Amino acid sequence: MGEEATAVAAAGVRPELVREAEVSLLECKVCFERFGHWQQRRPRNLPCGHVVCLACVAALAHPRTLGLECPFCRRACRACDTSDCLPVLHLLELLGSTLHASPAALSAAPFAPGTLTCYHAFGGWGTLVNPTGLALCPKTGRVVVVHDGKRRVKIFDSGGGGAHQFGEKGDAAHDVKYPLDVAVTNDCHVVVTDAGDCSLKVFDFFGQIKLVVGKQFSLPWGVEITPHNGVLVTDAEAGTLHLLEADFPEGVLRRIERLQAHLCSPRGLAVSWLTGAIAVLEHPCAFGRTGCNNTRVKVFNSTMQLIGQVDSFGLNLLFPSKVTASAVTFDHQGNVIVADTSGPAIVCLGKPEEFPALKPIITHGLSRPVALAFTKENSLLVLDTASHSIKVFKVMEGNGG
């Protein structure tokens, strides 16, 4: 308190006035956190005149209708009817450095991974052409990418060198026409979704075709492997999520099960090996009006119960610029991580039960991120289709995390 009083006196402001302002004016009366300029703590005017922080607006709002009631007078409104409370923001600027940081806010801040820094990149134009999907081999750490080259599947070693490729561009059943995504099974088989003939194709690591699954899909898009070596596939046109079980070495499909229906153009897909949760990235306007780039992340638990969801509008309440999710993954702590092509950026949404929460972890060095994968060493691989490359990010010393 002595240092705080000295700073206040040096600024020419009476300490008792600052303390009164902090308690009466500069504190959200719902969560009791201090207002601030960073997005979650920005003061927001409700239509009734009461002021709460943006994080509380998002928490109070209904996830679909965005309707909420003022916690003080119970007047109904919508989240989009709120606005920045300029008098409180101006008061924050006037008091400036005389305010000290809230210990609760400081302790709550690091809910997500620290800021990541790019320390390596590989691929590039010619080596890769308009890449669309990225996966890691769980046994060898090799990096598998699907792209628009003459041979559609390219495999790099863990350092980005020693590439070999397969999957000829052609019309034969074992060729790959238009790959959208890729995954690698626990026994090192490469699974590719092919929009060209609406099929799922499985290869061994030498490029030998093992299995082709067609007719069951209208437009297979995202693909991911479960901890039990099942294959999850989203069908963007049918709005479904399927689970396939197969004997990959023998090339025998054991069964296929529809886990979810009535999804809105599901594309990206991720599985948490920590909790078994499944994240699906929807594009509600994909087959609707042009110019609409709204996206939605839905997270289901291992029994396919919905445990969290957030869409572009909800994220925009917490972030100053529009967020358009293009890829989703889980980190090793179970946080949901999305690639944002509007930023461009990589953003942590927190754990599903914490939605909506948001923390940018990569804000520089990207052009158009379209796929994400975490290594066992906790580095994050980002497939940047605009630069035709894979960029490797990790927490550097001094960045926290």
Swiss-Prot record:
The gene is Nhlrc1. CDD domains: NHL_TRIM32_like, RING-HC_malin. NHL repeats lie at residues 115-159, 163-206, 207-247, 250-303, 304-352, 353-396. Keywords: Autophagy, Endoplasmic reticulum, Metal-binding, Nucleus, Repeat, Transferase, Ubl conjugation pathway, Zinc, Zinc-finger. Interacts with AGL. Interacts (via the NHL repeats) with EPM2A/laforin. Forms a complex with EPM2A/laforin and HSP70. Interacts with PRDM8. PANTHER family: E3 UBIQUITIN-PROTEIN LIGASE NHLRC1 (PTHR24104:SF47), E3 UBIQUITIN-PROTEIN LIGASE NHLRC1-RELATED (PTHR24104). Disruption phenotype: Significant impairment of motor activity, coordination and balance; spontaneous myoclonic seizures; and decreases in episodic memory. 3- and 6-month old mice contain numerous large insoluble aggregates composed mainly of polyglucosans called Lafora bodies (LBs) in skeletal muscle, liver, heart and brain. Glycogen levels are increased 1.6-fold and 1.2-fold respectively in skeletal muscle and liver of 6-month old mice. Glycogen phosphate levels are increased 1.5-fold in skeletal muscle and liver of 6-month old mice. Pathway: Protein modification; protein ubiquitination. This is E3 ubiquitin-protein ligase NHLRC1. It is found in: Endoplasmic reticulum; Nucleus. E3 ubiquitin-protein ligase. Together with the phosphatase EPM2A/laforin, appears to be involved in the clearance of toxic polyglucosan and protein aggregates via multiple pathways. In complex with EPM2A/laforin and HSP70, suppresses the cellular toxicity of misfolded proteins by promoting their degradation through the ubiquitin-proteasome system (UPS). Ubiquitinates the glycogen-targeting protein phosphatase subunits PPP1R3C/PTG and PPP1R3D in a laforin-dependent manner and targets them for proteasome-dependent degradation, thus decreasing glycogen accumulation. It catalyses: S-ubiquitinyl-[E2 ubiquitin-conjugating enzyme]-L-cysteine + [acceptor protein]-L-lysine = [E2 ubiquitin-conjugating enzyme]-L-cysteine + N(6)-ubiquitinyl-[acceptor protein]-L-lysine. Its EC number is 2.3.2.27. The keyword Transferase applies. The RING domain is essential for ubiquitin E3 ligase activity. One of its GO terms (molecular function) is zinc ion binding. A zinc finger (RING-type) spans 28-74. One of its GO terms (cellular component) is cytosol. The lineage of its organism: Eukaryota, Metazoa, Chordata, Craniata, Vertebrata. GO terms for biological process: autophagy; glycogen biosynthetic process; glycogen metabolic process; positive regulation of protein ubiquitination; proteasome-mediated ubiquitin-dependent protein catabolic process; protein polyubiquitination; protein ubiquitination; regulation of gene expression. Its main location: endoplasmic reticulum. InterPro entries: 6-blade_b-propeller_TolB-like, NHL_repeat, TRIM-NHL_E3_ligases, Znf_RING, Znf_RING/FYVE/PHD, Znf_RING_CS.
